[in-house]
Amino acid sequence: MKVYINDTKLINKKFYPLELFYSGYLPNIKSNIDPKKFYTIMIVDEDAPSKTNPINKYMIHLLIINNKTTIFDYKPPNPPINSGPHRYHVLVYEQSNIIDKFNINIDSRPKFNFDKFVLTNILKLFDKFMFQTERI
């Protein structure tokens, strides 16, 4: 998987300054998907509000189903001040079927039940990427 912010190609598992994500550009996510299949794409923060106290794990920063149906628009990383580095996961899941967006019952971005969503929708991990950032 390749992830770009503006012209910056991110490197898997690297740390980036928070300002990079406030450039006004959406992330450009590239993966070798099969155009005949359907995928779910998400970006989640597992360290919300902090790695030592992740009570809002997982915070959704992007959720797209069926290749192009947006459930949650992109929201740039926004970790609390002095909460330490946050790990942001960019995930692409292959879907076994088309997901009915009206059957998705997610009320808010924090406390996303990641495991339940994957199991309920019979998703298979296809590609993954992780970057870190923090607010000092």
Regions found by a protein language model. Name each.
Residues 1-136:
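N-terminus-centered regions that define maturation/targeting leaders and the start
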